Design a protein with these regions (language model features):
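Start-of-domain marker
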Residues: 23-89
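Structural register within alpha-helical repeat arrays
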Residues: 29, 66, 73, 134, ...
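Single-residue signature of alpha-solenoid repeat helices
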Residues: 43, 96-99, 154, 202, ...
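Canonical positions in the second alpha-helix
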Residues: 50, 161, 208-209, 242-243, ...
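Structural marker of alpha-solenoid helical repeat scaffolds
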Residues: 53-55, 164, 212, 246-247, ...
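Residue-level recognition of tetratricopeptide repeat
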Residues: 56-59, 168, 216, 250, ...
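TPR alpha-solenoid repeat register
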Residues: 62, 170-174, 185, 218-219, ...
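Short coil/linker segments at helix-helix boundaries
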Residues: 69-149, 156, 164-184, 330-360
Length: 401
């Protein structure tokens, strides 16, 4: 047993210097490449590989060489652009993005090594000043990638821009209170996440995005659609309500909220919603039509047809409102037919109601010829009861197809 332990100790004592020498050579090679301005991506990759070893994660020298490798890539592209040479703009922005990651990581390492004492931090002030000058590249780079429909990279840059406000290295700059573009950057993370169909990314900075009041209406819509796709009805409705409260003239928030309340048979809430929308925009025929739909469901027929006629006055081509008005009379007629005993009075009432329903249903058919499932049976019944032979024969053949 003793021999085995002794052998292991000897083997380790032989391997450690070899490993250290190999690591030193790798660092030295990377430094030489950076100094010569060649194989910069290779130098960056080798330093990142070293940092994957937990034994190296606190090695400041590796972090600094890594930073120099990335910085040199950034400066190379920047120089090409300055000299108006052919340059890959995306490489400039991505190198800037990686520099932030490297120096923020080094700052964390130094903080831990120095025993959480800011006064002993050797690099923080210098690196913070350097990155502060480049911070705009994260924002502009995000816009650049949005323009290229590269939403993945755009999201990464905007997220890094926002996170600067939380990074200890930038504490002296108080970005949270001094940077007015954080809200807009957050909006773009919502947008990019939505375009990637990534719910987690869409919602990650959604609260911050609401600081951008200019684009708030779009933020609410992307949030609402994301919650709807997640089948999170509670959050979906909450966002819709917030959106409608701020933008009562928006058809998006109104229509989706109305559909929710109507399907839940919350008719009083739906009516109140319609009234708020009408108050906000008296010319809104959508809200008027929606209100007529609720009144029809509540069997408040006189109020319903009154509103339908108002909509028709405003827009004679609004097809569905003719259906609602026609159903006001048709539904009453079918109810009488089911409940009243046969009599002359019953026949007279039926004919009177069917005659009132007729022009609305005919106009609905004219405006919505493909909606046979909605106008077919009502017109068939009306023609039959009003003894309209020619019209009845035509629709009878149509219904049998």
């Amino acid at each position: 047993m003793f021999r085995k332990i002794l052998f292991m100790v000897l083997a380790l004592s032989i391997c450690l210097p070899t490993m250290c020498n190999a690591q030193k050579k790798e660092i030295s090679k990377a430094k030489d490449n950076v100094k010569a301005g060649k194989s910069l991506e290779e130098a960056e990759a080798s330093m990142r590989k070293l940092l994957t070893d937990s034994a190296n994660k606190d090695n400041e020298k590796i972090w600094l060489v890594l930073f120099d490798a990335v910085r040199k890539q950034y400066e190379t592209v920047n120089e090409q652009m300055y000299l108006k040479q052919k340059a890959d703009t995306s490489k400039l922005f991505l190198a800037a993005y990686r520099m932030f990651g490297v120096l923020e990581g080094l700052d964390s390492v130094e903080w831990n090594l120095k025993g959480v004492q800011p006064a002993k931090m050797k690099y923080r002030k210098r690196h913070a000043e350097y990155l502060n000058q480049l911070k705009g590249n994260l924002y502009n780079g995000g816009l650049f990638f949005v323009g290229k429909n590269d939403y993945k990279n755009a999201y990464s840059l905007f997220a890094a821009y926002i996170d600067c406000a939380k990074q200890p290295i930038f504490a002296a700059y108080d970005y949270q209170n001094n940077d007015k573009r954080i809200g807009t950057a957050a909006f773009y993370t919502v947008y990019c996440g939505y375009k990637q169909n990534d719910a987690e990314r869409t919602l990650a900075y959604a609260d911050v995005a609401q600081q951008d009041t200019i684009r708030l209406i779009m933020t609410y819509q992307y949030m609402a659609e994301t919650y709807r796709q997640k089948a999170d009805t509670t959050k979906f409705v909450e966002v819709l309500e917030s959106g409608f409260a701020r933008y009562p003239q928006s058809k998006y928030f109104f229509s989706h909220l109305f559909d929710h309340y109507y399907k839940q048979s919350k008719y009083d809430v739906a009516i109140a919603l319609c009234d708020d929308a009408i108050e906000a925009d008296t010319s809104s025929i959508v809200a008027l039509f929606a209100k007529s739909t609720v009144l029809l469901a509540q069997q408040k027929y006189n109020d319903c047809v009154s509103i339908c006629d108002k909509v028709i006055e405003k827009d004679k081509n609004f097809a569905d409102v003719y259906l609602n008005a026609g159903l006001v009379y048709f539904n009453q007629a079918t109810y009488i037919e089911r409940t009243m005993r046969h009599s002359r009075e019953k026949t007279q009432k039926l004919k009177a109601l069917f005659k009132k329903a007729l022009p609305y249903m005919q106009e609905y058919r004219k405006l919505a010829p493909n909606e046979k499932s909605k106008w077919g049976i009502p017109l068939y019944t009306i023609y039959l009861n009003l003894n309209m032979g020619r019209e009845f024969e035509e629709i009878d053949k149509l219904m049998k197809k």
